[in-house]
Amino acid sequence: KRLLAEMDTPVMLMPIDDFGTQDIETLYHHTYHRQGNEEILSSILPDLNAVAVFAINKDLKLVIDDHFNDIRLQPLMQSVWTHLYRRSYAGPRRKLYAYFHDKRMEVFSFQQNRFRFSNSYEVTNEHDALYFLLYIWKLTGMDTEKDELYLVGGLPYQEWLLKKAKEHLKFCRVLD
C-alpha cells in the first residue's frame, strides 16, 4: 500500500546547502511553538534549492507507519510551490503568488531557482489580505508597473480583492 500525505502544519524553509549542518529540530522549535508530541520531518525541494521542515503528530505517524508500506509525507504547500515555480518562468516579470486556503494566505515568490520570499498569514477578511499583500510588495521591492501578483486558491472575496489590488498594481490576475 502506498500513501502520499500532505501535512497542513507550519513549514520552515531553509537553504539546501545549510540542511546537513544545522540541528533542524532545534531550529524548528525556535521558529514555531511545538506541542511536544511531534516528530520533525523534512522534504527536499531540489528545484528550489530548499528543504521544507515540518512536524507530524507522533501518534498519527505511528498509525500511518502501521498501515502503509510506501509512505511519502510532504507539506501541504509543496505541490503548489512546485507548480507555481514552473509557471514563474513564463514572461520577464517578477511574480508574487498568494495562495488562499482555510482562512490562511501563503505568500511567496521565486528568484534564481530559490525562494525569494515565503510567509503564511491568517486572514479573516479581505482588508487584512490586501494589507499584507501590499506590505509584502513594498518589502520585497517589487515594481507596481512591471511585476505581477497572482491570486490562487479559494478566495471568498476574490472580486473585491482583485479590484482593490488593481488600484495599486498594474498586473494582478487570478489563477484557477
Residue ranges, per PLM feature:
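Active-site neighborhood for divalent-cation/phosphate handling
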Residues: 1-85
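Gly/Ser/Thr-rich loops at beta-strand to alpha-helix junctions
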Residues: 9-11, 104, 156
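Short amphipathic alpha-helical segments
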Residues: 16-17, 109-111, 162-163
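A short secondary-structure junction signal
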Residues: 64, 108-110, 118-120
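Charged, elongated alpha-helical/coil segments that serve as electrostatic interaction surfaces
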Residues: 83-88, 92, 154-156
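Gly/Thr-rich phosphate-binding beta-strand-loop-beta motif of the actin/hexokinase/Hsp70
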Residues: 87-114
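Accessory, usually C-terminal, subdomains that scaffold auxiliary metal cofactors
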Residues: 116, 120-176
